[in-house]
């Protein structure tokens, strides 16, 4: 057993030692984001994550969870989740001013940017998107196209009712001007009902 917990060693130093003494157990503190952590650490909290950080996390063999609710390095978080499937990677994605946990299945939006549409890819459990109101019809079209491409259900809310974008008949009684803008996103719509 090599006890190096009080030595200042890098991951490169550790690799050299491991090659020189492959049958020895090496006890050490892992350098990560400017601090050192016990090799048996099972939970880490991060606010940022680089590709190098993702690789360094491999040294934490006991790691069970990475808490990253304030981290917006989504590509690296997704890479970590793919690289270490046994590690829970907890993060949230902000879309249309709301935070959605990575295991969110349904998202509701009224306004969305191109960047936020791309962020939907970091919600691996996402099965449905609902458009509520329509501040930017062009963006909603892009969102609908994205959903179709990814196999995600796209629906629209009119008043208190939600309809899939494949609806053919719709009652528009009492809907708002913003909701009227959504009608252009219903390519199969054939009949409108309006009372009063």
Predicted regions and their residues:
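Concave beta-strand-loop units of leucine-rich repeat
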Residues: 1-10, 21-75, 82-138, 145-182, ...
């Amino acid at each position: 057993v090599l006890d190096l917990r009080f030595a200042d060693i890098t991951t490169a130093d550790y690799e050299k030692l491991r090659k020189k003494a492959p049958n020895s157990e090496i006890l050490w503190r892992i350098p990560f984001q400017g601090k050192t952590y016990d090799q048996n650490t099972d939970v880490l909290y991060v606010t940022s994550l680089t590709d190098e950080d993702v690789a360094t996390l491999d040294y934490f063999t006991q790691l069970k969870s990475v808490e990253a609710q304030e981290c917006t390095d989504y590509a690296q978080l997704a890479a970590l989740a793919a690289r270490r499937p046994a590690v829970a990677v907890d993060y949230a994605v902000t879309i249309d001013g709301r935070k959605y946990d990575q295991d969110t299945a349904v998202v509701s939006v009224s306004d969305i940017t191109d960047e936020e549409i791309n962020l939907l890819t970091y919600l691996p459990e996402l099965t449905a998107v609902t458009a509520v109101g329509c501040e930017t019809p062009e963006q909603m079209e892009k969102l609908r196209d994205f959903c179709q491409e990814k196999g995600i259900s796209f629906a629209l809310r009119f008043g208190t009712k939600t309809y899939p974008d494949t609806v053919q008949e719709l009652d528009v009684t009492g809907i708002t001007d913003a909701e009227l803008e959504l009608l252009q996103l219903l390519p199969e719509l054939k009949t409108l009902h309006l009372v009063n």
